[in-house]
Each structure stands twice: as C-alpha cells, then as structure tokens.
C-alpha cells in the first residue's frame, strides 16, 4: 500500500498518518528524515546533498528522488509506505512516475483556511516543558497558565494568524497543481484519489480512511 498524503499544515494529517502507520504497519517517509539519515550515513547521495546544503542551496529533485528510491527499497517498505511532504511539485510527481514508483492512494485532507487559522491560533504553549494547550479544544485549568507550573503560556510564532495564513498561501500555491495532477492520474486509472473532510472528529476520519483502504 503506497500512499501520498496531501493537506495543509493544521489539517490533521499527522494524526491520521500515525493511524495509518499503526493500522497497516507501513513506515512514514519524510524527505527531511531521509536527508538527515543519508548525510549521517555518508552515502553517495548523502555527500551530494551535504555539499549542496553547505553551499546554502536547495537540494535538487534528482537527489531527493534518488533518496526516495533508496528508502523504499528497504525491507520495512515491503508492505508499502506513506509519503508526507513529497512530492511538492509536478516535476517531483513526474519524477516518481518516471522512476517506476507507483502510488496506490492519494489522500487529501480538506479543511477551510479559516478553520485552520482558528485551530492553530488557539494553540498555547509552555515552552520549557513542551506542553501544549488549545483555548477551545484543550484549555488549561487556569486561563493563560501551565497546569503543572502555573507559568505563563505563549503563542508560538508558527501559530500566529499571520504566519498561518502565509504558510497556507504557500501550501495552496504549491499543492493546487498536485491535486489536479493526481485527480487526472486517478481518472486515468493510475491511482485512487480520496478526499476526506478534516473538520470531522479524528476517530470519524480514521474510520472513513479504514473503510476506503479496505
């Protein structure tokens, strides 16, 4: 089962990725993790990536695709894998196809921007411990204070509405073409495209995924 996940930051993708990994026993492949592992292991591709990163440049699609191919050839991917954060562009999606990497399912988690802004901007964090709260969904016992220490909670830079909106803008710009691409692929019978309502309860979405992948 080879799966690609699409969804804006804050759409609940990470939670469902964990559910799929546990349920089907397949690993999640993140390009960031792969890059770090290849650099640490000093593989040929790792060395190439390191020299590019050290020069302050972006790692090419060619190197990333090489890493993906190496990674999915490993034993733990025998039953399949979950790609998150890749492909991000049409050339990357084409690259996967040209390298003979077939995808069984593309799962999109759809949540309106205003809902994501509300979700993210309601987050509060206690930085020293890493504990997180939400003013609506998981409020602290006392407003604005950490449950255990009573220290003040903060809004992380990443959760501020303007930051969230900027990230969403980039996401839509990058991902809208991919959504169209994989819908076309599904029409051609090359993959199955499934769209889920990310505003539903986590357990509901998980149940829908399980049913769709059965």
Curated annotation (Swiss-Prot):
Top EC group: transferase
GO molecular function ontology, one term from the record: ATP binding
Pathway annotation: Purine metabolism; AMP biosynthesis via salvage pathway; AMP from ADP: step 1/1
CDD domains found in the cross-reference section: ADK
Subcellular location: Cytoplasm
Keywords of this entry: ATP-binding, Cytoplasm, Kinase, Nucleotide biosynthesis, Nucleotide-binding, Transferase
EC number: 2.7.4.3
Region annotation NMP: where it falls in the sequence: 30-59
Region (LID): 122-159
Binding site for AMP: 31, 36, 57-59, 85-88, 92, 156, 167
InterPro entries with a match to the protein in the record: Adenyl_kin_sub (IPR006259), Adenylat/UMP-CMP_kin (IPR000850), Adenylat_kinase_CS (IPR033690), Adenylate_kinase_lid-dom (IPR007862), P-loop_NTPase (IPR027417)
Binding site for ATP: 10-15, 123, 132-133, 200
Keyword presence, Cytoplasm: yes
Substrates-to-products reaction catalysed: AMP + ATP = 2 ADP
Major localization class: cytoplasm
Family membership: Belongs to the adenylate kinase family.
Domain notes: Consists of three domains, a large central CORE domain and two small peripheral domains, NMPbind and LID, which undergo movements during catalysis. The LID domain closes over the site of phosphoryl transfer upon ATP binding. Assembling and dissambling the active center during each catalytic cycle provides an effective means to prevent ATP hydrolysis.
Record note on quaternary structure: Monomer.
Function: Catalyzes the reversible transfer of the terminal phosphate group between ATP and AMP. Plays an important role in cellular energy homeostasis and in adenine nucleotide metabolism.
Protein name: Adenylate kinase
Organism name: Aliivibrio fischeri (strain ATCC 700601 / ES114)
Lineage: Bacteria, Pseudomonadati, Pseudomonadota, Gammaproteobacteria, Vibrionales
Gene (name only): adk
């Amino acid at each position: 089962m080879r799966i690609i996940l699409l969804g804006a930051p804050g759409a609940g993708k990470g939670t469902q990725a964990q559910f799929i990994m546990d349920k089907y026993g397949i690993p999640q492949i993140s390009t960031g993790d792969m890059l770090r592992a290849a650099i640490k292991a000093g593989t040929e591709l790792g060395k190439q990536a390191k020299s590019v990163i050290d020069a302050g440049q972006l790692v090419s699609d060619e190197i990333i695709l090489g890493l993906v191919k190496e990674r999915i050839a490993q034993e733990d991917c025998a039953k399949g894998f979950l790609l998150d954060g890749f492909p991000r562009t049409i050339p990357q999606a084409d690259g996967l196809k040209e390298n003979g990497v077939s995808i069984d399912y593309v799962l999109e988690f759809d949540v309106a921007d205003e809902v994501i802004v509300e979700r993210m901007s309601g987050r509060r964090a206690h930085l020293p411990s890493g504990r997180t709260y939400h003013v609506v969904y998981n409020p602290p016992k006392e407003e604005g204070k950490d449950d255990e220490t009573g220290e003040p909670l903060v809004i992380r830079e990443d959760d501020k509405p303007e930051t969230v909106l900027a990230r969403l803008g980039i996401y839509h710009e990058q991902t809208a073409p991919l959504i169209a691409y994989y819908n076309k692929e599904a029409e051609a019978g090359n993959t199955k495209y499934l769209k889920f309502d990310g505003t539903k309860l986590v357990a509901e979405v998980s149940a829908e995924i399980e049913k769709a992948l059965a």
